């Protein structure tokens, strides 16, 4: 049994899930980020599955999404990379709030996400060594080059603030903790080549000892039951 509800964390509305009777107890905690044009509620099956496995799950709405969306779809579609950047800069306050409320057990804080959320997870891993482990599904850490083809910004300078979180020149920061990469080979939004590139770079540098990379044939840009199960297994093993 689990408990599922809405809480504000650092002023941001989140979906909050825990095993029943544990809402105010310290638990190993997963901060999980949703995809672009989606919301915390659409991805709530991750909260359910992970809470059933014993974790606290905190799923924020990204800027201009879910409870934070004002209905201006055209504006949102032009702000992909700026929204990703906002995910990065909001993390510190959310983490601090969770710790201040005594909700994270023994510094066991993980980050996961899918699509834009998977990009968020990889970027945060480069800057936050305190994160215990990371799961990135359908994501990429190569923001500065991916922006050439995925939601290219009208102003190329919009990508510049993402440099600090791009994985290209800091692979070692992805190698010192467990990392799960999952991607559907037939992904028609974020190419699976993004995950393959990262996995290959880690292997070639001898930095893959804690890497789990799973690629599913014939799967497009969607989360499968197998991907959900792999994510739960990963956090059960490493968080």
Where in the sequence are the language-model features?
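The feature captures the conserved acid-bearing segment of alpha/beta-hydrolase catalytic domains
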Residues: 144-202
